[in-house]
Amino acid sequence: MEYALFKNRSYQGVISKGFGLYFSHFRLFLKTSWLMAIIFALVFAALEMLLSVQLPSLSATIMKQELVLKTGLSPEVAQQYLLAVGITLLLILLYIMVEALTVGTVLNKLKEHHDTNTMTVPKRWFYISRQMMGRTLKGYVFTIVTMLIPVIVLAAILVGLLYIASDALTTWMIIVTVCYTVLGLLSLPMLFVFMKYVMNKGKSYFSLLGSSYARGLRHWGHIFTTLLIGGLTICVLAGICCLPTIILAQAHWSSQEGFLNGDPLGMPGYITTLSFITYFLTGFILVYICMPMLMIVYYMYGSIETFEQEKNKLDI
């Protein structure tokens, strides 16, 4: 099966080639990324433990002190809660960074495929390919910042409108929903910008941003359809993978709700260890469930680039 990147393809062809490249080279991608996937899974598990165990437990303690016991919030609990929130925010930043570095190990191989149409299998299992990590991390940061700017500007405008017409809350909520939906749809070409930046070393992000975004916007329908169909498949698999995590998190939340109402926690002593192991395994498996999306975006980028090159030749 031929996996050339630069070929004009329909969305079906892009998705098919993306999954095909992934499954035909699964051992290569596993060997390239498994160490970073373990680090990602550890961060994922730690973050999930805070969100599903520690923060709900502290929240239940605070609510019990304030609403049930009427004793007021103790300084110790307040400090613990603020510390947990601070650690959670740091873990979210670490999560984004480790995710970018994990993606970078795979993009290193896709860059090799981009340049030579081949990919070599690493000789060692205990090896982290670092060539594309820095560029991928910069691409992540630049893309997130670029997307956050219009979000913040729009939020400021909408808050100003709410202040002017505070009595029209329902209308304001509809406007917010519509505005952010449109903004989200308009941000889809940023995936093309990201892939273009990563695959073209030597070019700065912001020198590519305007022209690449305009090019992606011209192919918005192709990008939307590709991401919708490919993403739905991956989301279903990811949802199935996350079921044990969701069930455990719900059990923790229900236990804390019972504690708030005066019931004992009722959770076995090993639940913390079981939860961490479950979250870790879920995080590790999620890396490889979501990885085909990288290949889909990669081939989508190649298809758009080929279409534009062929169009320019015809114009000449």
Which role fits each region the language model picked out?
Residues G13, S24-H25, A165, V182, ...:
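Intrinsically disordered, low-complexity regions enriched in small/polar residues
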Residues E2-F6, K17, Q54-Q79, V103-T116, ...:
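Juxtamembrane transition segments at transmembrane-helix termini in multipass membrane proteins
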Residues T32-L55, A84-A100, K138-L162, W172-S187, ...:
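Hydrophobic alpha-helical transmembrane segments in multi-pass membrane proteins
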Residues T61-I92, G104-F192:
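Transmembrane alpha-helical insertion/packing segments
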Residues Y3-L42, P122-I149, L188-A238:
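Interfacial aromatic "cap" segments that immediately flank transmembrane helices
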Residues A4-F19, S24-R27, W34-Y81, V85, ...:
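Generic N-terminal leader segments that precede the first folded domain
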